[in-house]
Design a protein with these regions (language model features):
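Positively charged, aromatic-accented nucleic-acid-binding surfaces
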Residues: 1-29, 33-38, 63-121
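Short, structured secondary-structure boundary patches
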Residues: 45-46, 60-64
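Residue-level detector of alpha-helical secondary structure
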Residues: 29, 44-47
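Key DNA-contact positions within bacterial/archaeal DNA-binding proteins
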Residues: 39, 43
Length: 121
């Protein structure tokens, strides 16, 4: 079986974000990216999946937990959803990067996104 190539998001201490290729990250890599604990990352991921906002990558390996099957890797859509749900310095830096890349660095749009984030929590 051919293993698919995957990439992770890299964030430096000065806030520089590097996203290259086909982003697929494990829960532990996501926790490291946002500077949070594994269990907290997993809890946020499950809440986002339950709300139907984003899903994991079921085309790669999966983990069975009782009768449920969870993907082992999550893509950019989940990472973006998490960045607007998690409150950490790294999540804030990633939100800024996302807004800059989307061409929406306007503070009014940023305030709107923060208010929607409050509803998610």
């Amino acid at each position: 079986m051919k293993e698919e190539k995957r990439e992770v998001i890299i964030m430096t201490d000065n806030g520089t974000v590097t996203v290259s290729g086909h982003v697929r990250m494990s829960v532990s890599e996501i926790a490291d990216l946002f500077g949070i604990y594994y269990r907290e990352a997993k809890r946020h991921i499950r809440a986002i999946e339950k709300a139907g906002i984003a899903q994991g990558d079921y085309t790669m390996s999966c983990i069975a937990d009782g009768l449920k099957v969870y993907p082992e890797y999550y893509g950019l859509e989940m990472i973006i959803a998490l960045s607007f749900r998690i409150q950490s310095k790294n999540a804030q830096e990633l939100r800024k990067w996302i807004l800059l890349k989307a061409g929406a660095a306007d503070s009014r749009i940023e305030a709107l996104l923060y208010s929607k984030n409050i509803v998610l929590n």
